[in-house]
Amino acid sequence: MTRKESPVSRTPKSARAVAVNSPLGRTVRLELPAHSAGERPHGLPLPSVVVLGRSNVGKSSLLNAVLATKVARVSQTPGRTQALHWYRVDDAFHVIDCPGYGYAKTARESRDRFAGQIEELLTGERGPDLALLLVDGRLGPQDSDRSMALFLRTAGIPTVVAATKWDAVKSSQRVRQLRALAAEFEDPERPLLPVSSETGENLPTLGRLLKDRLIGRPRMGAAPAAPQGPRKKES
């Protein structure tokens, strides 16, 4: 007989706050690995930023770098993040790491489940206050990233875009690549920042930008359902 999971999960006993020295804060802990968008950390809701991106965009590496601790599991195999991971920073806000989207080798059932989790999280009554959309700086704009950016805009979620793996972009190509990304994603309400988990380029700036936009921002209410999004209908 399997134990029925509570829709509101408590912090695991093994999840202890880790002292860090990062642009986002001084302590961080994994508060909840959730397998459905309905699972939330126990207690009063805190402001939250959701981290989104294609599989293998470097989400886990970036989270570890910007939080200055190895809290997220890093794998060379795309699609290893298979739950919503809630990280509590300074007891002030949550960072939510989502499964990556767009990895063709992931089983369709899993892709649909991940897409459903993300859509429910973004459009639910207690949606995130901010989104960090990661795009691969080496590849330029991808259709799946365009779709997610549109989904976030339609849902009314303020967004910061970070171009990852910037250290792997040749110096001679950086200006052209950044212009292409900016033309697609950047506007006065949606800043774009090239970053590198390897060299630390622009990570302090990214951390301060996210924190400034989270702290003091009023909690969002229900986000309107988006007409289109990352979820695919099951056959």
Predicted regions and their residues:
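Conserved C-terminal guanine-recognition region of P-loop GTPase G domains, centered on the G4
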Residues: 116-190
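Residue-level signal for inorganic ion chemistry
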Residues: 87, 164, 206
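Glycine-rich, phosphate-binding/catalytic loops in enzymes
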Residues: 68-69, 80, 111-114, 148-152, ...
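Flexible beta-alpha connector loops of hexameric P-loop NTPases
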Residues: 101-111, 138, 167-170
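Canonical P-loop GTPase G-domain recognition
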Residues: 25-38, 168-223
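Amphipathic alpha-helical transducer elements in NTP-driven molecular machines
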Residues: 81, 111-115, 142, 200-203
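Conserved G1/Walker A P-loop phosphate-binding module
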Residues: 2-105, 215, 220-234
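Active-site glycine-centered loops adjacent to acidic/histidine catalytic or metal-binding residues
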Residues: 97, 164, 196
